[in-house]
Amino acid sequence: MAIIAITEQQLSLAAAFHIRARLVSRFGARLGRLWRFPSAERLAGASLQELSSCGLSRRKAEYVKGLAERVTHGLLDFDVLKQQSDDRIREQLLAARGFGEWSVEYMLARGFGRADALPSSDVGLRRVVGHYFGRGRRLSPGQLERALAPFKPFRGLAAYYLAVHWRLRRSVERTPG
């Protein structure tokens, strides 16, 4: 999930999915018709040029490689980390190059299953929640937190369901007939 967090930073989901698919097909292991996500060892051994050829910017390629190296050298252990408090996870992830607040909240929610984790700086999420709670206007990070406060300790989960509903609704609206 940490590599996925890096690939999704400041990109549309479509662009991030495309990059991830290229990473997986280039460095992952084929399992019949499916692919296994690349191991940390495989990504750590890749050159920056090879990683960039999958669509990553040079900086993101450095982040992916650096993160993979931290994992392979035992400096970052996600199995141990998931047992820690949210604050301890934040501290450890922010120490890794390429991780900011958005990536940490993403990892807390998707990587560690913390239902209250909320990436309040996410522009798309602020737009979606603003549609439902802000009279159609994109919310500020503070407004997003206040709008979802009644859902605590499940703010991240509530935001996820709102985003899914938003996407499904838009998909139906675009479907002819």
Predicted regions and their residues:
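HhH-family (HhH-GPD) DNA N-glycosylase catalytic core used in base-excision repair
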Residues: M1-G177
